[in-house]
C-alpha cells in the first residue's frame, strides 16, 4: 500500500481523530446538534488542518526545535483567523450558529497534534494529504453524529443548509420524521454523549467483523514433507 493510501486509511477510519483518538470532543459534542452545523465546523477544521500542515511542513527546516510549539500555535491561529473571516463574510448565518467554536479550533488537539507528529517530519504534499485525511475523518464523524441527532430530535435533515451553501440549499431540507414536539434528549448534551457512544460501538463492531472476515479468508496451504512427496510420486 502506498504512503498516500495509508494516510487516507488512517485518517478516515483506522486512526480516526474523533472515533479512535477521541480528540476534539468539545466541538464534536457541542456543535453536532444539526447536520449543517456539524458539516460546517468539520469543513472549517479540515481547511485549517490542510493549511497548517502545509505551512509547518514547508517551514520545518527553519523552525528551531526549542520554540517549535509556540510557532505552530501562531501559524494555527493565523489560519483559523483567516477561516473565521471567510465564514463571517460568505456564510454569516453559519458563523452566528457556530459562534465561539470557530476560534476554538486553535486549541483543537487534532490540529497541533498532526503538526507536531507528522507535518514537522514529512514533505509538504504528504503533510497536506495527512491534514485532509484527518480532517475528513473528523468531518464524517461530526456529520453522522449531527445527522443522527437532528433526525431523532427534530425529524429533519439538512435543516438550515442555506446557512452553509446559500439560499438555493433550502431545497435540501428533508422531513424524515413528523414529530409533534422535538425529542429534547437528542438535542441536549446527554444525547450527544449517547450518540457518540453508539458511533464508537458501531465502529468497534465493524472492526471486529472485518478482523473475523480476514481471519476466515486466510488459506493455509500445508506443505508436503519429503516423505509424503515421494509417496505421492
Swiss-Prot record:
Keywords: Cell inner membrane, Cell membrane, Electron transport, Membrane, Translocase, Transmembrane, Transmembrane helix, Transport. It is a multi-pass membrane protein. Its main location: membrane. Its EC number is 7.-.-.-. The chain crosses the membrane at residues 18-38, 39-59, 69-89, 92-112, 128-148, 182-202. InterPro entries: NqrDE/RnfAE, RnfE. It is an enzyme of class 7 (translocase). Coiled coil: none annotated. It is found in: Cell inner membrane. It comes from the Bacteria. One of its GO terms (cellular component) is plasma membrane. One of its GO terms (biological process) is electron transport chain. Belongs to the NqrDE/RnfAE family. HAMAP family: RsxE_RnfE (MF_00478). NCBIfam families: PRK12405.1 (NF009070), rnfE (TIGR01948). Part of a membrane-bound complex that couples electron transfer with translocation of ions across the membrane. The complex is composed of six subunits: RnfA, RnfB, RnfC, RnfD, RnfE and RnfG. This is Ion-translocating oxidoreductase complex subunit E. It comes from Yersinia pseudotuberculosis serotype O:3 (strain YPIII).
Amino acid at each position: 500500500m502506498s504512503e498516500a493510501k495509508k494516510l487516507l486509511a488512517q485518517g478516515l477510519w483506522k486512526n480516526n481523530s474523533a472515533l479512535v483518538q477521541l480528540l476534539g470532543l468539545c466541538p464534536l459534542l457541542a456543535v453536532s446538534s444539526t447536520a449543517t452545523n456539524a458539516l460546517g465546523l468539520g469543513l472549517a477544521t479540515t481547511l485549517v488542518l490542510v493549511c497548517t500542515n502545509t505551512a509547518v511542513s514547508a517551514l520545518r527546516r527553519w523552525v528551531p526545535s526549542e520554540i517549535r510549539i509556540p510557532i505552530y500555535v501562531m501559524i494555527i491561529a493565523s489560519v483559523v483567523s483567516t477561516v473565521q473571516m471567510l465564514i463571517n463574510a460568505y456564510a454569516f448565518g453559519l458563523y452566528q450558529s457556530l459562534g465561539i467554536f470557530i476560534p476554538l479550533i486553535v486549541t483543537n488537539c487534532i490540529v497541533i497534534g498532526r503538526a507536531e507528529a507528522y507535518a514537522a517530519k514529512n514533505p509538504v504534499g504528504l503533510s497536506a494529504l495527512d491534514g485532509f485525511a484527518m480532517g475528513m475523518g473528523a468531518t464524517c464523524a461530526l456529520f453522522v453524529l449531527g445527522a443522527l441527532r437532528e433526525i431523532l430530535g427534530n425529524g429533519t435533515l439538512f435543516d438550515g443548509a442555506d446557512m452553509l451553501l446559500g439560499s438555493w440549499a433550502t431545497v435540501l431540507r428533508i422531513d424524515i420524521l413528523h414529530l409533534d414536539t422535538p425529542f429534547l434528549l437528542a438535542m441536549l448534551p446527554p444525547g450527544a454523549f449517547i450518540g457518540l457512544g453508539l458511533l464508537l460501538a458501531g465502529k468497534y463492531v465493524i472492526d471486529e467483523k472485518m478482523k473475523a472476515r480476514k481471519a476466515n479468508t486466510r488459506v493455509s496451504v500445508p506443505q508436503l514433507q519429503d516423505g509424503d512427496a515421494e509417496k505421492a510420486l
